[in-house]
Amino acid sequence: MSEENSSSPPKKVRIYSRRGDLGETSLFSGPRVGKDHPRIEAVGAVDELSCAIGLARSFGLPEETDGILERIQRKLIEIGTEITAMTPGRHAVPTIQPGDVRALEELIDAAGESLPPLTSFVIPGGTPPAAALQLARAVCRRAERALVVLLRSDAAFSRRPIAWFNRLGDLLFVLARRL
């Protein structure tokens, strides 16, 4: 390596490619699809959910709640990768296993034990972290709907994430009530 090369400034990394300027994007599995494709809609909703959870976490939640939500964000990244990497017509090993749904149910039950019974609809608000978790719950329901559309358009997509997102919405609701 010459001295000339070692003293040159590091190459800047461009975040833009211009390849999506006409409304298409690439999947990890290779093909290009429209940005309104069910897979892109679903992965976008999953990404928005992770961002909404991140917003809630930024308010400084109790350590246990923060840990739960961080693990969920990591799972959401795996799910997003699964959505964009799956090959049409080929079943992949799903990210969500039956035990994952049961684990959310156990968290819901434990978090809800100390809460008073509901006597009316909950109006989102209260504390900033509770409001942020309610927003995350609403985004979760949108992601769930996007996954239903994806399942209808591509039977190779596993049904398990739909149940997981259904429980996740319930968990976010219960966690918001605790704040």
Regions found by a protein language model. Name each.
Residues 1-179:
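Phosphate/pyrophosphate-binding loop motifs in nucleotide- or prenyl diphosphate-using proteins
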